[in-house]
């Protein structure tokens, strides 16, 4: 049985003071959850959060990584740098990276390969826009996104990735896919994974990343192919994040 994963994506939020308060509040009520938990924080705060989480089972993650190893790539962060801060996870291909920074399926695949080669666990994000969903293109668009990654990685690396389905139309809009709508896409993704490596496909965790909140987490997480959540806004509020963790 797949152990669920709840990963908080802080996006471009936080401060030294706010981070310390948030993590202190989470740790105070954390207990011994039945799921894995991670926080993916802005790169400048990795050192601070590594220190704050040193006595916790909460894993540390980054929000992006360079497809390059090192060199003259101003502003980029390499896998080696992330490893120095004990990162376990790294988000690749988030819808905001695709929409605002022009990241292509090919670049996302390259970043995934780079992360895997360094021993990081990439959280590979896929998802469709409202326009694409209304045009009946969900399977086509999301399928292309995941296939670009699957065709680039070795068969025996499949079990080392996490997939996150984030319907773009449900992020920050207040709209949420019904559990059944989300499950339908997760099943499609599982089938794609199965075609790559049948055994590994049963082990890969597929997270839901479309505005999971305390009031919908339990229903979403009850779906057989929803193996956790990639949490945005709710990860910035200790009570909300803890409620989702408990629902998992």
UniProtKB/Swiss-Prot annotation:
Q: List GO molecular-function terms, semicolon-separated.
A: triose-phosphate isomerase activity
Keyword hit for Ubl conjugation? no
Any one Pfam family match given in the protein's UniProt record, by short name: TIM
Q: Does the keyword Nucleotide-binding apply?
A: no
Reactions catalysed, semicolon-separated, are: D-glyceraldehyde 3-phosphate = dihydroxyacetone phosphate
* Sequence positions that bind substrate: 9-11, 172, 211, 232-233
Q: What does this protein do?
A: Involved in the gluconeogenesis. Catalyzes stereospecifically the conversion of dihydroxyacetone phosphate (DHAP) to D-glyceraldehyde-3-phosphate (G3P).
The active site consists of 94, 166
Q: Which family does it belong to?
A: Belongs to the triosephosphate isomerase family.
State where the protein is found: Cytoplasm
Name listed for the protein in its UniProt record: Triosephosphate isomerase
* UniProt-listed InterPro entries: Aldolase_TIM, TIM_sf, TrioseP_Isoase_bac/euk, Triosephosphate_isomerase, Triosephosphate_isomerase_AS
Enzyme Commission no: 5.3.1.1
> Which key words are in the record?
Cytoplasm, Gluconeogenesis, Glycolysis, Isomerase
Its quaternary organisation is: Homodimer.
Q: Which GO terms describe its biological process?
A: gluconeogenesis; glyceraldehyde-3-phosphate biosynthetic process; glycerol catabolic process; glycolytic process
Can you list the GO cellular component terms from the UniProt entry? cytosol
Q: What is the lineage of its organism?
A: Bacteria, Pseudomonadati, Pseudomonadota, Betaproteobacteria, Burkholderiales
- SUPFAM superfamilies on file: Triosephosphate isomerase (TIM)
Name the pathway it acts in: Carbohydrate biosynthesis; gluconeogenesis; Carbohydrate degradation; glycolysis; D-glyceraldehyde 3-phosphate from glycerone phosphate: step 1/1
- Identify the PROSITE patterns for this entry: TIM_1 (PS00171), TIM_2 (PS51440)
């Amino acid at each position: 049985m797949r152990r669920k994963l709840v990963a908080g994506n802080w996006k471009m939020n936080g401060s030294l003071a706010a981070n310390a308060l948030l993590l202190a509040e989470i740790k105070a009520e954390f207990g011994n959850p039945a799921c894995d938990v991670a926080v993916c924080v802005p790169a400048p705060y990795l050192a601070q959060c590594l220190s704050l989480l040193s006595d916790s089972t909460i894993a540390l993650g980054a929000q992006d990584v360079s497809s390059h190893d090192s060199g003259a790539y101003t502003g980029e962060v390499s896998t080696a740098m992330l490893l120095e801060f004990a990162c376990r996870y790294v988000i690749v291909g988030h819808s905001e990276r695709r929409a605002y920074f022009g990241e292509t399926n090919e670049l996302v695949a390259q970043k995934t390969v780079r992360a895997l080669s360094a021993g990081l666990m990439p959280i590979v994000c896929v998802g469709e826009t409202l326009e694409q969903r209304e045009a009946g293109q969900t399977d086509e668009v999301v399928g292309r996104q995941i296939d670009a990654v699957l065709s680039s990685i070795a068969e025996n690396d499949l079990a080392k990735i996490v997939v996150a389905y984030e319907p773009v139309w449900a992020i920050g809009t207040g709209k949420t896919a019904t559990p059944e709508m989300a499950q339908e896409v997760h099943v499609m993704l599982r089938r794609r994974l199965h075609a790559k490596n049948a055994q590994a496909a049963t082990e890969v965790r597929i997270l839901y990343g479309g505005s999971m909140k305390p009031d919908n987490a339990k229903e979403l997480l009850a779906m057989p192919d929803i193996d956790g959540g990639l949490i945005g806004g709710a990860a910035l509020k200790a009570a909300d994040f803890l409620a989702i963790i408990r629902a998992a």
